[in-house]
Structures are given as structure tokens and as C-alpha cells.
Swiss-Prot record:
Tissue-specificity statement: Detected in pancreas islets. Detected in pancreas alpha, beta and delta cells, and in chromaffin cells in the adrenal medulla. Detected in amygdala, hypothalamus, autonomous nerve fibers and ganglia, especially at synaptic contacts. Detected in pituitary (at protein level). Detected in brain, specifically in cerebral cortex, diencephalon and brain stem.
Record's protein name: Receptor-type tyrosine-protein phosphatase-like N
Record field: compositional bias (Polar residues): 148-158
Residue ranges, Lumenal side: 41-579
Organism for this UniProt entry: Rattus norvegicus
Predominant location category: membrane
A matching Pfam family: Y_phosphatase
Membrane-topology annotation of the record: Single-pass type I membrane protein
Site (Cleavage): K452, S453
Skewed-composition ranges (Low complexity): 652-681
């Protein structure tokens, strides 16, 4: 988005904003500017903001900020950028930034364009006369012109004694043009070498924030640390004559980040330190072409192994043979060098004889750089005038356009070796000239050669193949889990690896990223480490590398780079066979676990179906197998044959109802099992014989139909839930004085069906208690009293209800505490006696019948009337609050014990759980239905029975599971009675 034009813009000099210095600068620029204003000026700064150029323009590299031009056919401006120029531009940018201006502002564009006009320009390159295509530029001018004809005006003994530079093997000689990088760097270098020394300039500081976006986009770092490190590496190379480190291929980055000067008006030239850096740039821009030839393996050295040398490290191999071509004569090379040196010095009006030996030595070292890099342009070249629009990011990624080597046939068994990725090539130090390269015909026998290393060491090699056949290049690789792997992350990984193997980061060359892997090569180093050694060390320190980089290293090794830029692994160190085996075992265990879980689920489902079938088979003849059917039919025949022997219970005289509880327990015929018995007998007492077998058959068929037809059971339960009792008011229970006596507000007694206490005997002077009488058939005699678990302040009311109703049996269906929630308060003493209002309760005994229930005996006394009674509490322990017991057998056995104690009583049974609804209603429903069947009732309707009891207390049997449990319990009891019939 373009910012609005500010008052201090080009329209005038009287803006109210900004400092006085900036306004004065703008006024001076306006007075000295062109009449056309800034409308005709192309935008500057597209390297920092790509939005400055329209879709019809491209951003070209001008060595500073980038300039928008319409099309790529125009010549690139050649600016003679020096340190004073950079200092001037830096000050202007700082002033513009302090005013809050951006590249989009017209004032910024106008000021920058005026400053760019003041920078000296170099003449555009002219095509070389010998170049047919004319695509290779040649720089002309007094500082950079190379003359290919004529002899030097003179020669001095110092010149004759200088060592001659070698040829590059490609025919680059007298007429070799300079690259754009050389053309820009040679003039200030020569000026420094030939002119008198200047006083040292004060060091200037450069603020990276001014070019922070550019540094971040190109270097992958916001502080530009990589560029500065590279520049310092070049200076160190020139000082120590060591191997150069990787350097940026962009001239503008290094110049903008490192140039310094005195002032804009002082054009005496850059500082000596800067010239050394520029010479490092010039050196790094060179690239030695790699001819196609076979790589010779090195003979084993003492104490070391034989390692294959890298053919791209710039080391030339010398092949000796009887039919080889001889190198050019040394005299011809000397003439060529002297001609080139004289041509360069002629532009300065200096002759060779006027130079000192030190100056000649320095110039000769610089001259050795001139033939290299022929026809190459930093930042990418325009081939054949192709109209291709490139952004600066694409140019910086491509860098130097690599020469495509024609495919050559390889030896049998060797893969094709060609590299399609852009790589940074390293060359020899200029202090160690390369031997001339010769060719060898086919069929030559292997001979020992002396190959010069960068450190000047002589290393024997064996050449056994023709030099015209190159072999595949070997690369070290590290495969990570990040795909694609960024170049910044790959370089960081190699820097950390260099620290672990005690190498410098400059030892890694030809760094590139292929998918999740980073590939590299190793130059000669002091540790004499090869690619295999470095990759092996990377595998050993894999954990440290992963911890420091955050990447997971999957594989390391050495391989050959193919045309697809893929790496053929030769040696793997990342994943050990033990780890692979462990991962395989874990995967197999997971699959086996899934299969086992599936099998268990299927078995459980099959077992559930089988259990249902067995239950149906046990309930009636239709669902039973053949043996059960025959047994059932035989049972029916025996029952019909002996029917006269069994009379109905109505014809028999009822036993006396005045026997006490103590007599029941003292009767020897009815003695209970041992107190420590854990599994009570199922048929402990004889089943009653007054059930008609036809009635039992009808009941079993009814239960079987319910168990088979789940939909019918669901519909029946829905109808029960929709049933509403009439009347159903609970005004008394909701009264102000009675609401606190209720444990659960949803389960209250109806006004027409509630237990009323005597007010004169009640400690609270109220007749209310949360209890409901449940009538079976006689309204004058309720069979049950359904009540809630007593609260701490209603225990006295509970014992008053027990005393006034004459109850002798209490059925408790809940534990005192369940899952940390109190279900009922203890209303009896732990031991001894306790007084509740006027009722004294003594604990006589506590009989643990089994793990599911226990029996307690109490002695109850009214201290006012001195009357005493005995009563029994049956406490069932294994019934969860929101569910049902795991089996019906413990509850049915519990019911038998209760009825055995209650037999012959005319008083109601007090049944309570926590809320007096769910478990209480389920027990009452089961007991009422079974009692009716025992009395010989022909028709049984369990749903109608539940509606009958719900008319007297709401919420009895709270869930469908409890209703189904009641049906199952009734069916089990009927089946037990039929099995107990005499044979």
C-alpha cells in the first residue's frame, strides 16, 4: 500500500516535518535535479520491497538497491561503488528513515535517484572482437582494458625473473575478458597498489537494520552474520594463504555490508583492508572448469587408508605418456602475461620498468586471477537475449550458471555421473600454481603421478583409465526427518558437525539440499579426514546433533550424485539393525494386540448369546434342548399322576401367628448354617408344593417372551413411565416443617398414603415421616412399609414408627456409605444399647450370613411403658445405588431368609434403601409377585403389579434395568420351584 505524500516532499522545501538537515538536503537536490522531476525516474529499492515494480517491470541488480526496468534487454548499470559512496548513501538512508519515509514515498525515490546520479559509472561492456556470438562482455577503460595485441614497451629484470602464471587449460589467454565482478574490483585494487599510500581513515560502523529486509531474504539471517563471517574468512585467506571458505556470490551484499570510506567528497579510494576484502571477492568469483577425465585413486599412505580425491576441488592431475601433447612453451606464456600486465598498466601511464619488485610481485599475483571465470557473470547471465523475468531471489538462488558438461561414455559398470544442482566451486590458492594439464590416449598403462595438494604436500596417485572419462562424484549426505530441509538448517547442521569433528566450517564444500537430506563434500584438511570419516563421526554423534539442531537424523553415509540429484547410499549409520528389529517387533505386537482384542470381543458376544440361550432353555421347553424337553415332559406327567397327593395351600390350616422371632431361631429343624458360611444352599428349605404346574408353565412362557422380545420390554417400560397415579399430591411432605425430614426431594409420600405418627409421642410434635404403607390386597393390613434411610435427626421418628406399627422385621438394602456418599445414617448402636427419645435399642447379635448380607437382632424397649419387643434386621450389602446386583441368586436367597423369619406374622415388613424408591420398590415387586404365585394365583401381570404399588408411593422401581432384574428374579424363582417338585 502506497503511503500518502508528505508535506515535505518534492513539491517544496518548506515542509513542517523533518529535521532541518533533511529539508536542506531535499532543497539542494531539487535545485540541482533534472527538470523532469521524479516522474520519469525508475523506482529504486526493489531488492528490499518487490512491490515497487509493476507487473511489466523487472528488478535488475545495480549493485546497491535494485532498480525497476521495463524488460530485461536493457544493459545493467555499472556503478563504481566505493566506501565514501556507501557512507554517503548510509547517511541519506538514515535521514529518510528518521522521517518515517519508506521506499514507496516519492521523496525517497527522488532523493535516491539524485544520489545514484552522482555515483561514477563505468562504461558498458563491449563484445570481444574474437567472440562470434558477442555475448561475452569485455570491459574497456583505463583501469580495466585488456589489450591483446602489441608488446610491452619494455621489460625489466624484475619482470623477467617473475614466475609465469599457468594456463587454465581451456584456451583462455590473451583475449580472455573479465567478468563483471573483476571489472568492478580491479580498478580500486590497482589504484591502491600504484598510487601513494593514503592516511588511514577512521573506521565506520554500519547499521544492519538499514538493510535488514535484504539480509534476511537473501542470507536467511536477520543480522547478516553469514556475510560478515564470509568476508572475514576471505581476509584470513589472503593473510595466511589457507583454503578459502564459502563466500556469498552476491557482490552487493558484501559491498553494502563491508565498504567504508571517509566522506563523499573524498574520492581517494577505499582502505587497504577493504581492498583485501575486494581481492578476496575477486578470488572467490573464479571457477576452474572441470574437464571430463577419470578420477585416479590415491595410493595408501603410511598410517592411513587410500581415499578417492574429489575431482571438483580444483586439483589437476598430470598424465605421463609417450603420445601425450606437450604443454605450451614457457616463453609464450611469459609474453602473454607481460602483454596483459603492460595493457593494464598503460591505462595508468605506468611502465613495467618503473615498478618496484614488490609491486610487480603483487600485480602478478593479481594477474593470475584474470584468465579464470571466462564468460561468467555473477548473479546469473542472460543467454541468447531470452526475455525472462527474474526476481532477485531467483538470481541469488541460481548464482553462477554452471557450465553443462556434455555426456561422455563411462567405463563398464560405472553409473553416469553428472550434477544438475548449482554448487559453490573451490579453486586452488593463487600462491600455488597448477601444473599444465595434458591428455592421455586410450590404452595407457597405469603410472604413478605426483599431485600437488593445497598444502604443498606431494601425494602419489595412480591413473589407470583414460582422462576423457569422468567417474561419478561422491558426496557425503545426512538424511533428516524434515522434508523439505531448508538450506539454512542444513548449513547449521554442518557447522555443528564441524565443531564435533574439530574442523572448520570452510572444510565443507558443494553444500546442497536434496529433499530431506543435505549433501556436501570435504576439502583437504589438517585432520586429513575423508567423506567416510566425517559421515561416520556424524553417525557417532547423532544424538548430540539432534539435540542441538532439533532435527532427527535418519541416515548418514557416502553416495554418488546422479542426474536426478539423488544420493545412492553406500554406507548407513543412522538406524541400527537392532532398532529396526525393535520397531518391527513393536508393530507386530500392536497388530497382535488388535487381533486379540477383536477375538475377545467376539468371544464375549458369542458367550452372551449362548448364555441367553441357556437361560431360555432353563425357563421353558421351547428354548431347551432335547434332554431338557424330555425331562420337563416327564416332570409334567409325574405331576399330573400324583396331583391327588398335593393339596392347595388354601385347604390347609395356617400356622399360628403368635410365635416369636426367638422361637424361629431356636427351632432345630430351621437352624441356619454356620455363621462363617460364604455360599448358602440354594434349596435350603423345601419349595412350596401349592403351585400348579400349568401356572408355572404359563409364567415361564411369559418370561421367555419378555427376554426374547426386547422391544416389548422397552414399550412396556415406556408405558410405566408415562403412568400417573391419582391422587398424587404431596403437600404434607413439602410443608415448611417437614421438608428437612426428606433425604431426596423427588421421592415423597402421597398425602393419602403415608404413615402418621402419634403427635403426643413424637419429639418434634409432628406426625410426618417419609414412609408409605404398601397394601397388597387388604387395605386394613399393609404388607410393607416403604421408607427412606433415616437421617440423623429422624432416627427417633423411625423407631417410633417401628414401635407403633408393631414391626418385627426390617429389610435394609443399602450400605451406609457408597463411593464416598452417605446413603443412610446408622440408626442402631455399634454395641450395647442406645436411647433414641423414649426408645432404648440393644444390639443382641450380628450374624454375618455371607458376603452379600448379614442379620442383626435387636431388643427394643419403651422406657415410658417398660414394654419390650424383639426384632430382626436383614441387611443386604451387594446392591449398588444406580444399578442391580450381579446375580439374582443372592437376593433370592436373602428373600428366603427374610420370609423364613417373618412366616406367620401379621405385621408389615419395613423395607428401606437410601431414597425409599428404586431398590425398595424392586424388592417389594419381586416379593409380592412370588407371594401371589405361591398362593396359587392363575394370572400374573408384573407391569400391573408395579402400577399398583406406584399408586401408593411414587418412584418405586426407578430404572428399566431394575424392572428387567425383577422379571429375571421371578423367572429364576419359578424355575427353582419347578425343579424342587417331588419326582
Amino acid at each position: 500500500m502506497r503511503r500518502p505524500r508528505r508535506p515535505g516532499g518534492p513539491a517544496g522545501c518548506g515542509g513542517s516535518e523533518g529535521s532541518g538537515g533533511l529539508r536542506l538536503l531535499v532543497c539542494l537536490l531539487l535545485l540541482s535535479g533534472r527538470p523532469g522531476g521524479c516522474s520519469a525516474i525508475s523506482a529504486h529499492g526493489c531488492l528490499f520491497d518487490r512491490r515497487l515494480c509493476s507487473h511489466l517491470e523487472v528488478c535488475i541488480q545495480d549493485g546497491l538497491f535494485g532498480q525497476c526496468q521495463a524488460g530485461v534487454g536493457q544493459a545493467r548499470p555499472l556503478l563504481q561503488v566505493t566506501s565514501p559512496v556507501l557512507q554517503r548513501l548510509q547517511g541519506v538512508l538514515r535521514q529518510l528513515m528518521s522521517q518515517g519515509l519508506s521506499w514507496h514515498d516519492d521523496l525517497t525515490q527522488y532523493v535516491i535517484s539524485q544520489e545514484m546520479e552522482r555515483i561514477p559509472r563505468l562504461r558498458p561492456p563491449e563484445p570481444h572482437p574474437r567472440d562470434r556470438s558477442g555475448s561475452v562482455p569485455r570491459r574497456a577503460g583505463p583501469a580495466g582494458e585488456l589489450l591483446s595485441q602489441g608488446n610491452p614497451t619494455g621489460s625489466s629484470p624484475a619482470v623477467q625473473g617473475l614466475s609465469r602464471p599457468p594456463g587454465d587449460g581451456n584456451g583462455a589467454g590473451v583475449g580472455s575478458p573479465l567478468s563483471s565482478l573483476q571489472a568492478e574490483l580491479l580498478p580500486p585494487l590497482l589504484e591502491h597498489l600504484l598510487m601513494p599510500p593514503q592516511p588511514p581513515h577512521p573506521s565506520l560502523t554500519y547499521e544492519p537494520a538499514l538493510l535488514q529486509p535484504y539480509l534476511f531474504q537473501q542470507f536467511g539471517s536477520r543480522d547478516g552474520s553469514r556475510g560478515s563471517e564470509s568476508a572475514s574468512g576471505v581476509v584470513g585467506h589472503l593473510a595466511k594463504a589457507e583454503d578459502p571458505v564459502l563466500f556469498s556470490r552476491s557482490l552487493s551484499k558484501a559491498i553494502l555490508g563491508t565498504h567504508s570510506g571517509h566522506s563523499f567528497g573524498d574520492l581517494t579510494g577505499p582502505s587497504p583492508a577493504q581492498l583485501f576484502q575486494d581481492s578476496g571477492l575477486l578470488y572467490m568469483a573464479q571457477e576452474l572448469p572441470v574437464p571430463g577425465r577419470a578420477r585416479a585413486p590415491r595410493l595408501p599412505e603410511e598410517g592411513g587408508s587410500s581415499r578417492a580425491e574429489d575431482s571438483s576441488e580444483g586439483h589437476e592431475e598430470e598424465v605421463l605418456g609417450g603420445h601425450g601433447e606437450k604443454s605450451p612453451p614457457q616463453a609464450v606464456q611469459a609474453d602473454v602475461s607481460l602483454q596483459r600486465l603492460a595493457a593494464v598498466l598503460a591505462g595508468y601511464g605506468v611502465e613495467l620498468r618503473q615498478l618496484t619488485p614488490e609491486q610487480l610481485s603483487t600485480l602478478l599475483t593479481l594477474l593470475q586471477l584474470l584468465p579464470k571465470g571466462t564468460g561468467r557473470h555473477l548473479g546469473g547471465a542472460v543467454n541468447g537475449g531470452a526475455d525472462v523475468k527474474k526476481t532477485i531471489e531467483e538470481q541469488m538462488q541460481r548464482g553462477d550458471t554452471a557450465d553443462a558438461r556434455p555426456p561422455t561414455p563411462l567405463l563398464p559398470g560405472h553409473p553416469t555421473a553428472s550434477s544438475t544442482s548449482i554448487k559453490v566451486r573451490q579453486v586452488l590458492s593463487p600462491g600455488f600454481p597448477e601444473p599444465p594439464k595434458t591428455s592421455s590416449p586410450l590404452g595407457i598403462s597405469a603410472v604413478l603421478l605426483e599431485k600437488k595438494s593445497p598444502l604443498g604436500q606431494s601425494q602419489p596417485t595412480v591413473v589407470g583409465q583414460p582422462s576423457a572419462r569422468p567417474s561419478a562424484e561422491e558426496y557425503g549426505y545426512i538424511v533428516t526427518d524434515q522434508k523439505p530441509l531448508s538450506l539454512v538448517a542444513g548449513v547449521k547442521l554442518l557447522e555443528i558437525l564441524a565443531e564435533h569433528v574439530h574442523m572448520t566450517s570452510g572444510s565443507f564444500i558443494n553444500i546442497s539440499v536434496v529433499g530431506p537430506a543435505v549433501t556436501f563434500r570435504i576439502r583437504h584438511n589438517e585432520q586429513n579426514l575423508s567423506l567416510a570419516d566425517v559421515t561416520q563421526q556424524a553417525g557417532l554423534v547423532k544424538s548430540e546433533l539432534e539435540a542441538q539442531t532439533g532435527l532427527q537424523i535418519l541416515q548418514t553415509g557416502v553416495g554418488q550424485r546422479e542426474e536426478s540429484a539423488a544420493v545412492l547410499p553406500r554406507q548407513a549409520h543412522g538406524i541400527s539393525p537392532m532398532r529396526s528389529l525393535l520397531l518391527t517387533l513393536v508393530a507386530l505386537a500392536g497388530v497382535a494386540g488388535l487381533l486379540v482384542a477383536l477375538a475377545v470381543a467376539l468371544c464375549m458376544r458369542h458367550h452372551s448369546k449362548q448364555r441367553d440361550k441357556e437361560r431360555l432353555a432353563a425357563l421353558g421347553p421351547e428354548g431347551a434342548h432335547g434332554d431338557t424337553t424330555f425331562e420337563y415332559q416327564d416332570l409334567c406327567r409325574q405331576h399330573m399322576a400324583t396331583k391327588s397327593l398335593f393339596n392347595r395351600a388354601e385347604g390347609q390350616p395356617e400356622p399360628s401367628r403368635v410365635s416369636s422371632v426367638s422361637s424361629q431361631f431356636s427351632d432345630a429343624a430351621q437352624a441356619s448354617p454356620s455363621s462363617h458360611s460364604s455360599t448358602p444352599s440354594w434349596c435350603e428349605e423345601p419349595a412350596q408344593a401349592n403351585m400348579d404346574i400349568s401356572t408355572g408353565h404359563m409364567i415361564l412362557a411369559y418370561m421367555e417372551d419378555h427376554l426374547r422380545n426386547r422391544d416389548r420390554l422397552a414399550k412396556e417400560w415406556q408405558a410405566l413411565c408415562a403412568y400417573q397415579a391419582e391422587p398424587n399430591t404431596c403437600a404434607t411432605a413439602q410443608g415448611e416443617g417437614n421438608i428437612k425430614k426428606n433425604r431426596h426431594p423427588d421421592f415423597l409420600p402421597y398425602d393419602h398414603a403415608r404413615i402418621k405418627l402419634k403427635v403426643e409421642s413424637s419429639p418434634s410434635r409432628s406426625d410426618y415421616i417419609n414412609a408409605s404403607p404398601i397394601i397388597e390386597h387388604d387395605p386394613r393390613m399393609p404388607a410393607y412399609i416403604a421408607t427412606q434411610g433415616p437421617l440423623s435427626h429422624t432416627i427417633a421418628d423411625f423407631w417410633q414408627m417401628v414401635w407403633e406399627s408393631g414391626c418385627t422385621v426390617i429389610v435394609m438394602l443399602t450400605p451406609l456409605v457408597e463411593d464416598g456418599v452417605k446413603q443412610c445414617d446408622r440408626y442402631w448402636p455399634d454395641e450395647g444399647s442406645s436411647l433414641y427419645h423414649v426408645y432404648e435399642v440393644n444390639l443382641v447379635s450380628e450374624h454375618i450370613w455371607c458376603e452379600d448380607f448379614l442379620v442383626r437382632s435387636f431388643y427394643l424397649k419403651n422406657v415410658q411403658t417398660q414394654e419390650t419387643r424383639t426384632l430382626t434386621q436383614f441387611h443386604f450389602l451387594s446392591w449398588p445405588a444406580e444399578g442391580t446386583p450381579a446375580s439374582t441368586r443372592p437376593l433370592l436367597d436373602f428373600r428366603r431368609k427374610v420370609n423364613k423369619c417373618y412366616r406367620g406374622r401379621s405385621c408389615p415388613i419395613i423395607v428401606h434403601c437410601s431414597d425409599g424408591a428404586g431398590r425398595t420398590g424392586t424388592y417389594i415387586l419381586i416379593d409380592m409377585v412370588l407371594n401371589r404365585m405361591a398362593k396359587g394365583v392363575k394370572e400374573i401381570d408384573i407391569a400391573a403389579t408395579l402400577e399398583h404399588v406406584r399408586d401408593q408411593r411414587p418412584g418405586l422401581v426407578r430404572s428399566k434395568d431394575q424392572f428387567e432384574f425383577a422379571l429375571t428374579a421371578v423367572a429364576e424363582e419359578v424355575n427353582a420351584i419347578l425343579k424342587a417338585l417331588p419326582q
